[in-house]
Structures are given as structure tokens and as C-alpha cells.
Amino acid sequence: IHWTLAPPVYKHSDLGKDSHPKKGGFLPPVTFPRRMWAGCETDFYSKLYIGDKVTKISSVDDISLKEGKSGKLCFVKAKYEFYVNNEIKIKEFHNIVYREISTNKNIQKVELPFEKFDNEKSIYTHPTIMFRYSAITFNGHRIHYDYPYSTKEEFYPDLVFHGPLQATLLLHLSEENANKTAKKFIHRGVSPVF
């Protein structure tokens, strides 16, 4: 739930065509137009409670250029720390990747080797779920709720299922099945999910 706390608020005029904040504010002025969630690493030191006065400190921890199958990539590692009464409660790193927009309509399906899981859960995905998650996390990225934009402007085959929503669902599933609160959570996105 900490992703809903202290989101950056931008005027409409400070948003890009994709409805993300224009680059060059908190995140660096990367020239690649496509922004994607590449994962996160979260340390939970102690719980947040209703009524806590939370201070969030955000910084850019690292920027690196790499070459991938789809071309040049720019990785930005953002660091977020959440404090209550000067005590750190949560420390998190977000990995964000920027790249060119490909007009290739044949997006490669990524098959990962999975072992049999002890616990599984099916969810029904719907654009309303993605819209609601976008709203509660203050994520305006149109690829999650604007089908014409996602398919005609960014050339995805469908709406893109939120990487952070995937992470949220995985974390909840693991906590439900372990019947305890996570102390550390690592999530890596390797391909868009539709």
C-alpha cells in the first residue's frame, strides 16, 4: 500500500503524450520514449499504520545504458525511503527502463522456465482493474487503460497489465500462503503482460 503514499503530483501541462510526467524533473531527461517497469526490490523494516505521518524521500540511485535484443536501453534505478518519526519503515528501489518504441507488431512471447508452484491463484483481469490501480497509485500511463493509445501509439497488442500490480498480487499471494508479513520482496519484469 506504500505505493499510494505521497505520489508526485503534476499539472496536466507537465505530462507527456503518454500521461507520464515529462522527463527531466525527478527522472532524468532520457531521450527514449517508451518507459517500462523493470522491477523492484523492497525491504520492509516495520509496518506502517493508519494515522502515521509518513515522510517519503526519493532519489535517483543509478543510471546505466545497455544494449538489448530490442536495441539501446536506459535503466534508471530510483530509491524511495519511507520514514515515520525519523525511523525508516520501508526502503525500495524501482528499476525503470526506457527504450525506443518498436512498430513491430510481432512482440515476442517470453517463455520462462517455471517449476511447479506450491500455491497458485487465478485472477480475472479487466480494464477496470487496471484503471483503478492506476488511479490509486496515481499512475497516468495510458498503456494501462487507454486501448487506442496502447495499440495505435505504442503498438502493443492490447492494454499492458501493470508491473506494479503484478508485484502487488504476488506479494499478497506469498503473504497469504506463508501467513506472515514479508520482510523483503524482489520482483523483476522481463516482458510486458497483456
Pin down the residues of each PLM region.
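Alpha-helical transmembrane segments of helical membrane proteins, especially in multi-pass transport
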Residues: 162-171
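HotDog/MaoC-like acyl-thioester-processing domains
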Residues: 37-125, 189-194
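A conserved acidic, glycine/proline-rich C-terminal tail/linker
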Residues: 170-194
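Catalytic strand-loop segment that frames the active site of acyl-thioester-processing enzymes
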Residues: 1-9, 96-161, 175
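Short amphipathic alpha-helical segments
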Residues: 38-40, 156, 185
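Hydrophobic, proline/glycine-rich low-complexity stretches
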Residues: 1-53
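Aromatic-acidic/polar surface patches that form glycan- and anion
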Residues: 47-49, 159-163
